[in-house]
Amino acid sequence: KVREGLHVGTGEKVAVKVIDKKKAKKDTYVTKNLRREGQIQQMIRHPNITQLLDILETENSYYLVMELCPGGNLMHKIYEKKRLEEHEARKYIRQLILAVEHLHRAGVVHRDLKIENLLLDENNNIKLIDFGLSNCAGILGYSDPFSTQCGSPAYAAPELLARKKYGPKVDVWSIGVNMYAMLTGTLPFTVEPFSLRALYQKMVDKDMNPLPTHISPAAISCLRSLLEPDPLKRPNIQQALANRWLNDNYHGKGHHTFPNRIHLEDLSQSVVLHMSEKLGYKHSDVINVILSNRACHTLAVYFLLNWKLEHYLVNMRKPDINDNVCHKNQFHQSEKYKMNKNSYEERRSKDLEKRGEQQQQRAIPRKLEKCSPSHRQSTCLTPQGHSSSKGPIKERRSSKSERESFGGLSPFHEVRITKTGCMNSCSLEYLEIQSPDPRTPKIMRRQDSHSQETVNVNMGSRIRETHLNVVRSFESVNREDQIESLSPNHQYRVLGSPMSFSPRHSSERTLSPIFHFDNTSPLKGHSNQASFTYDDKSSPSSPESMSPTSPHSPSCNNNISGNLGSPNCVRSRGRFPMMGIGQMLRKRNQVVSPKGEKPLETRMPPLHQMSPGYASFNSSDMNGFC
């Protein structure tokens, strides 16, 4: 199941693939595919392949956290439009071939290319998913032989259905089936009733379903070359990319290899600096994780913050007014005009001139106000500078500070803020103050009671000793169906029902309140290994067993929003996330507990309760003073 989730620390949405442990243990095929998918996606990096962010493990499930593709599944788009236009299908097929060519160069054969595994991002670009059936011989040290019958029969090449030896060209055939489906909305080879033998015979005989007349001859020629039943005559992925139809009206950059690892000079230094200085991550650890593309919470925070920064910069370049509606308040305008000092100087000089004119108008003697009514103008025709009633004069005097604060508003000075936490607006409204940088968490401090501070000492010492740099575990509501109710981590929250990869309105995505934080308890484990556990609900809660993620925990209340993305907010982590290549499901029998310094309470001498007669007082000195 794939669900839409929310990363709490950054506020960005992610896609979470949930795998049930019970099914994985019963079926070794599921376990093998899970291990293979996680390892391949950490080795491969391409703009048309989904980015794996984090891998989590709970008591009952595994979780693969990936980037979210808000455009939905390409299947739903074809279903809505019946078929795609030729220029749109050309764009998608070219991006798919680029992704597959990158895989083949790395020694990976996907073997399951179908419309259902093609997603669309926010820019309407293809994103390839699901590497569970991929073959990666020579990379991971193990692979299925290139004779295994796998994948969807409708997209499988003839040599694969015949259980013959095959190679990377099976992906070229699958691309041809996807191209036919995009242009027509149907599959090229269908049989009724379904039979593998009859389907194979249709493929070998080139008995393709009839093509519509609107398809160009160049597209038909490209399609027939991809659907060549003889693998020796079928083009390889490089030859398919050089097809004339795919390069017609293509104005993009020439084909170039895409590195599987981010180079040091390509890192977003602002995001790395924010993570190391504001969120508490070690600078060298952040660099090593990003350069190695190792799926963990640090990598997830980096990519999510980097995407959030890119979206913010794109929105800054958009026009201020769309459809005669201004979507940006004055605080945003003041930030924008910091980039242009000359325009600010011009506005400043004009505002000073207006102020001088207003002061000259106020210096007019009040005798003009006492003139006869016949010489007065009507109230509706009175200029704004000369009001005939005393009430508007008081209002004008009371709003003088507002005019001074906004009449010469300087983007290089602080904005005047009211006591209620809002700032004054030129439109006489109150606009809530928003941070100009959406990546900087706002620190909120709450005063806790003295009793909660004593508990916080014990909890804080253990947190500083372990210093986990990953995330916390879920708590289940219904133990019978853990997949439906589990959330892989308190840094990730599951939103809504399982994803169908169809574009949905933002108002339909609601947070499902399925979390009960009071039942979780952190483990005293090593910083590199901490399993997710579930406490017995019948056991009474105590200060020692109180979870830091509980709403009643003082350590959670103090920095509930300031340190959400920091490693100090982390409580526990499964064995699965800290895997290296080939170590994802390795059993670990021992849990090493660090020997930390004893709490302050254990080193203090025991306190004894004193009775009223225990202490003796000499009252001789007090005689005569009562």
UniProtKB/Swiss-Prot annotation:
PROSITE patterns: PROTEIN_KINASE_DOM, PROTEIN_KINASE_ST. InterPro entries: Kinase-like_dom_sf, Prot_kinase_dom, Ser/Thr_kinase_AS. Pfam families: Pkinase. It catalyses: L-seryl-[protein] + ATP = O-phospho-L-seryl-[protein] + ADP + H(+); L-threonyl-[protein] + ATP = O-phospho-L-threonyl-[protein] + ADP + H(+). Residues 336-407, 477-574, 590-615 are annotated as: Disordered. It comes from the Eukaryota. Keywords: ATP-binding, Kinase, Nucleotide-binding, Serine/threonine-protein kinase, Transferase. Residues 1-246 form the Protein kinase domain. The active site is at residue 112. In the egg, expressed predominantly in the animal hemisphere. This pattern of expression persists throughout the cleavage and blastula stages. At the gastrula stage, expression is restricted to the ectoderm. In later-stage embryos, expressed over the entire embryonic surface including the open neural plate at stage 15 and the neural tube at stage 22. In tadpoles, strongly expressed in the neural tube, motor neurons, brain regions and sensory organs (otic vesicle and eye). Also expressed in the perisomitic mesoderm, brachial arches and embryonic epidermis of tadpoles. This is Hormonally up-regulated neu tumor-associated kinase homolog B.
